Amino acid sequence: MMEKKLNYGCEGLCAVISGGTSGIGLETARRLLDDGARVYILGRSRERGMQAMHYLHEKTGQNAVYIPCDVTSSEQCTHAINKVAALEGDGFQLDILVNSAGFYREQRLEQLTEADFDAMMAVNVKGTMLLTQAALPYLKSGSAVVNIASDAALSGNYGCTLYCASKGAVVAFTRALALDLAPEVRVNCVCPADVDTPLLAKQLVDADGGYTLADMAAAYPLQRVGRTDEVAHVICSVASPANSFMTGSVVAVDGGITAG
Protein backbone atom coordinates (compact mmCIF):
# COMPACT_ATOMS: atom_id res chain seq x y z
CA MET A 1 0.00 0.00 0.00
CA MET A 2 1.35 3.43 -0.96
CA GLU A 3 2.08 5.68 2.02
CA LYS A 4 -0.13 8.75 2.20
CA LYS A 5 1.93 11.91 1.89
CA LEU A 6 1.47 14.23 4.86
CA ASN A 7 1.71 18.00 4.70
CA TYR A 8 3.63 19.68 7.52
CA GLY A 9 3.73 23.16 5.98
CA CYS A 10 7.53 23.16 5.76
CA GLU A 11 7.89 23.87 2.04
CA GLY A 12 10.75 26.29 1.40
CA LEU A 13 12.09 26.04 4.95
CA CYS A 14 15.68 25.11 5.86
CA ALA A 15 16.28 22.23 8.27
CA VAL A 16 19.44 20.88 9.92
CA ILE A 17 19.30 17.43 11.50
CA SER A 18 22.10 15.99 13.64
CA GLY A 19 22.23 12.21 13.67
CA GLY A 20 20.57 12.56 10.28
CA THR A 21 22.32 9.67 8.56
CA SER A 22 20.36 6.84 10.20
CA GLY A 23 17.34 5.89 12.26
CA ILE A 24 14.94 8.57 13.45
CA GLY A 25 17.05 11.43 12.09
CA LEU A 26 17.16 9.92 8.60
CA GLU A 27 13.41 9.32 8.53
CA THR A 28 12.81 12.89 9.72
CA ALA A 29 15.00 14.11 6.86
CA ARG A 30 12.96 12.04 4.41
CA ARG A 31 9.67 13.49 5.58
CA LEU A 32 10.91 17.08 5.54
CA LEU A 33 12.38 16.65 2.05
CA ASP A 34 9.07 15.18 0.91
CA ASP A 35 7.39 18.25 2.36
CA GLY A 36 9.53 20.61 0.29
CA ALA A 37 12.11 21.66 2.88
CA ARG A 38 15.82 22.08 2.18
CA VAL A 39 17.54 19.54 4.40
CA TYR A 40 21.09 19.26 5.74
CA ILE A 41 22.04 16.07 7.57
CA LEU A 42 24.95 15.93 10.01
CA GLY A 43 26.85 12.86 11.15
CA ARG A 44 30.33 11.57 11.91
CA SER A 45 30.61 8.88 9.23
CA ARG A 46 31.13 10.13 5.69
CA GLU A 47 30.26 6.68 4.34
CA ARG A 48 26.89 6.70 6.12
CA GLY A 49 26.39 10.28 5.00
CA MET A 50 26.83 9.34 1.35
CA GLN A 51 24.52 6.36 1.77
CA ALA A 52 21.92 8.57 3.43
CA MET A 53 22.00 11.13 0.62
CA HIS A 54 21.54 8.36 -1.95
CA TYR A 55 18.66 6.85 0.05
CA LEU A 56 16.91 10.19 0.44
CA HIS A 57 17.17 11.01 -3.26
CA GLU A 58 15.87 7.56 -4.14
CA LYS A 59 12.90 7.92 -1.79
CA THR A 60 11.95 11.55 -2.45
CA GLY A 61 13.57 12.62 -5.70
CA GLN A 62 15.05 15.53 -3.72
CA ASN A 63 18.63 16.14 -2.61
CA ALA A 64 19.72 16.48 0.98
CA VAL A 65 23.23 17.74 1.76
CA TYR A 66 25.49 15.77 4.09
CA ILE A 67 27.95 17.72 6.25
CA PRO A 68 30.44 15.84 8.45
CA CYS A 69 30.06 16.82 12.10
CA ASP A 70 30.88 15.36 15.49
CA VAL A 71 28.51 17.23 17.79
CA THR A 72 30.83 16.76 20.77
CA SER A 73 33.19 19.28 19.13
CA SER A 74 32.33 22.97 19.38
CA GLU A 75 34.60 23.67 16.41
CA GLN A 76 32.87 21.08 14.21
CA CYS A 77 29.40 22.29 15.20
CA THR A 78 30.31 25.86 14.29
CA HIS A 79 31.90 24.75 11.02
CA ALA A 80 28.83 22.70 10.06
CA ILE A 81 26.35 25.50 10.74
CA ASN A 82 28.55 28.05 8.98
CA LYS A 83 28.74 25.70 5.98
CA VAL A 84 24.96 25.60 5.85
CA ALA A 85 24.84 29.40 6.09
CA ALA A 86 27.34 29.74 3.23
CA LEU A 87 25.34 27.37 1.03
CA GLU A 88 22.07 29.11 1.84
CA GLY A 89 23.40 32.60 1.14
CA ASP A 90 22.60 36.09 2.42
CA GLY A 91 19.80 36.50 4.92
CA PHE A 92 19.99 32.87 5.97
CA GLN A 93 17.51 31.71 8.60
CA LEU A 94 17.65 28.24 10.09
CA ASP A 95 13.97 27.40 10.32
CA ILE A 96 14.24 23.93 11.87
CA LEU A 97 16.99 22.41 14.02
CA VAL A 98 16.56 18.79 15.06
CA ASN A 99 19.06 17.54 17.65
CA SER A 100 18.81 13.82 16.97
CA ALA A 101 22.38 12.61 17.58
CA GLY A 102 22.41 10.23 20.52
CA PHE A 103 24.38 7.58 22.38
CA TYR A 104 23.03 4.63 24.37
CA ARG A 105 24.60 2.07 26.66
CA GLU A 106 23.18 0.03 29.53
CA GLN A 107 25.35 0.06 32.65
CA ARG A 108 24.60 -0.07 36.34
CA LEU A 109 26.03 2.71 38.46
CA GLU A 110 28.64 0.48 40.10
CA GLN A 111 30.01 -0.40 36.64
CA LEU A 112 30.42 3.17 35.43
CA THR A 113 33.78 4.82 34.96
CA GLU A 114 34.42 8.52 34.58
CA ALA A 115 35.19 7.87 30.90
CA ASP A 116 31.75 6.24 30.49
CA PHE A 117 30.15 9.29 32.07
CA ASP A 118 32.04 11.69 29.82
CA ALA A 119 31.23 9.74 26.64
CA MET A 120 27.48 9.62 27.33
CA MET A 121 27.17 13.23 28.41
CA ALA A 122 29.36 14.45 25.54
CA VAL A 123 26.93 13.27 22.88
CA ASN A 124 23.54 13.44 24.56
CA VAL A 125 23.92 16.66 26.54
CA LYS A 126 26.95 18.62 25.36
CA GLY A 127 26.31 17.77 21.71
CA THR A 128 22.72 19.01 21.90
CA MET A 129 23.82 22.23 23.57
CA LEU A 130 26.85 22.88 21.33
CA LEU A 131 24.98 22.50 18.05
CA THR A 132 22.15 24.69 19.31
CA GLN A 133 24.66 27.27 20.48
CA ALA A 134 26.31 27.30 17.05
CA ALA A 135 22.91 27.74 15.41
CA LEU A 136 21.77 30.64 17.63
CA PRO A 137 22.78 33.45 15.23
CA TYR A 138 20.55 31.91 12.55
CA LEU A 139 17.54 31.03 14.72
CA LYS A 140 15.16 33.89 14.05
CA SER A 141 11.47 34.68 14.32
CA GLY A 142 9.48 31.55 13.53
CA SER A 143 12.39 29.11 13.90
CA ALA A 144 11.87 25.84 15.76
CA VAL A 145 14.26 23.61 17.70
CA VAL A 146 13.30 20.00 18.38
CA ASN A 147 15.48 18.07 20.82
CA ILE A 148 15.25 14.28 20.91
CA ALA A 149 15.32 12.84 24.42
CA SER A 150 13.79 9.50 25.48
CA ASP A 151 11.10 7.87 27.58
CA ALA A 152 14.08 7.22 29.90
CA ALA A 153 13.99 10.94 30.70
CA LEU A 154 10.44 10.57 32.01
CA SER A 155 10.66 7.35 34.03
CA GLY A 156 13.47 5.19 35.36
CA ASN A 157 14.82 2.26 33.38
CA TYR A 158 16.73 -0.64 34.92
CA GLY A 159 20.49 -0.48 34.42
CA CYS A 160 20.33 2.90 32.70
CA THR A 161 21.13 5.46 35.39
CA LEU A 162 23.56 7.41 33.22
CA TYR A 163 21.44 7.31 30.07
CA CYS A 164 18.35 8.39 32.03
CA ALA A 165 20.30 11.26 33.57
CA SER A 166 21.62 12.41 30.18
CA LYS A 167 18.20 12.43 28.55
CA GLY A 168 16.65 14.06 31.61
CA ALA A 169 19.15 16.85 31.11
CA VAL A 170 17.94 17.28 27.52
CA VAL A 171 14.37 17.72 28.79
CA ALA A 172 15.49 20.33 31.33
CA PHE A 173 17.60 22.11 28.69
CA THR A 174 14.59 22.21 26.37
CA ARG A 175 12.34 23.85 28.93
CA ALA A 176 14.95 26.41 29.98
CA LEU A 177 15.89 27.30 26.40
CA ALA A 178 12.23 27.68 25.45
CA LEU A 179 12.02 30.48 28.01
CA ASP A 180 15.26 32.10 26.87
CA LEU A 181 14.39 32.12 23.16
CA ALA A 182 10.70 33.06 23.42
CA PRO A 183 8.82 34.65 21.79
CA GLU A 184 10.80 34.42 18.53
CA VAL A 185 11.96 30.79 18.60
CA ARG A 186 10.07 27.69 19.73
CA VAL A 187 11.92 24.88 21.53
CA ASN A 188 10.32 21.49 22.16
CA CYS A 189 11.37 17.95 22.99
CA VAL A 190 10.25 14.57 21.65
CA CYS A 191 10.76 11.50 23.84
CA PRO A 192 10.65 8.20 21.92
CA ALA A 193 10.70 4.83 23.63
CA ASP A 194 12.31 1.79 21.98
CA VAL A 195 12.24 2.22 18.21
CA ASP A 196 13.32 -0.25 15.54
CA THR A 197 16.60 1.41 14.53
CA PRO A 198 20.26 0.37 14.11
CA LEU A 199 20.79 1.61 17.68
CA LEU A 200 18.15 -0.82 18.96
CA ALA A 201 19.64 -3.67 16.93
CA LYS A 202 23.02 -3.00 18.57
CA GLN A 203 21.35 -2.92 21.97
CA LEU A 204 19.93 -6.41 21.39
CA VAL A 205 23.29 -7.71 20.17
CA ASP A 206 24.99 -6.28 23.26
CA ALA A 207 22.39 -8.04 25.43
CA ASP A 208 23.76 -11.34 24.05
CA GLY A 209 20.48 -13.20 24.42
CA GLY A 210 19.65 -11.62 27.77
CA TYR A 211 16.47 -10.30 26.20
CA THR A 212 14.92 -10.25 22.74
CA LEU A 213 12.80 -7.91 20.65
CA ALA A 214 9.75 -9.95 21.71
CA ASP A 215 10.64 -9.45 25.37
CA MET A 216 10.99 -5.74 24.78
CA ALA A 217 7.67 -5.50 22.91
CA ALA A 218 5.82 -7.33 25.69
CA ALA A 219 6.55 -4.49 28.12
CA TYR A 220 4.49 -2.03 26.07
CA PRO A 221 0.72 -1.55 26.32
CA LEU A 222 0.68 -1.54 22.49
CA GLN A 223 2.69 -4.80 22.53
CA ARG A 224 5.36 -3.63 20.10
CA VAL A 225 8.26 -1.21 19.75
CA GLY A 226 7.95 1.94 17.68
CA ARG A 227 8.82 2.64 14.06
CA THR A 228 11.02 5.46 12.84
CA ASP A 229 8.21 6.88 10.69
CA GLU A 230 5.96 7.19 13.74
CA VAL A 231 8.53 9.22 15.68
CA ALA A 232 9.58 11.28 12.65
CA HIS A 233 5.95 12.21 12.05
CA VAL A 234 5.73 13.69 15.55
CA ILE A 235 9.05 15.53 15.14
CA CYS A 236 7.90 17.10 11.87
CA SER A 237 4.53 18.01 13.39
CA VAL A 238 6.19 19.67 16.38
CA ALA A 239 8.56 21.57 14.08
CA SER A 240 5.74 22.63 11.76
CA PRO A 241 4.77 26.31 11.64
CA ALA A 242 1.22 25.06 12.18
CA ASN A 243 2.21 24.34 15.80
CA SER A 244 3.17 27.96 16.41
CA PHE A 245 1.72 28.07 19.97
CA MET A 246 3.75 25.08 21.16
CA THR A 247 6.99 25.67 23.07
CA GLY A 248 8.65 24.16 26.13
CA SER A 249 6.62 21.00 25.57
CA VAL A 250 7.82 17.44 26.11
CA VAL A 251 6.04 14.93 23.88
CA ALA A 252 6.21 11.19 24.60
CA VAL A 253 6.03 8.80 21.63
CA ASP A 254 6.29 5.66 23.67
CA GLY A 255 3.53 3.13 23.06
CA GLY A 256 2.14 3.89 26.52
CA ILE A 257 5.22 2.72 28.43
CA THR A 258 5.27 5.81 30.68
CA ALA A 259 1.51 5.72 31.32
CA GLY A 260 1.71 3.16 34.11
Give residue ranges: language-model regions.
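Substrate-binding pocket helix/loop in short-chain dehydrogenase/reductase
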Residues: 108-109, 113-118, 216
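C-terminal helical subdomain
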Residues: 189, 211-246, 253-255
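Conserved glycine-rich cofactor-binding loop
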Residues: 14, 21-22, 45
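Active-site helix of classical SDR
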Residues: 132, 166, 174
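Residue(s) in the substrate-gating loop at a strand-loop-helix junction
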Residues: 150
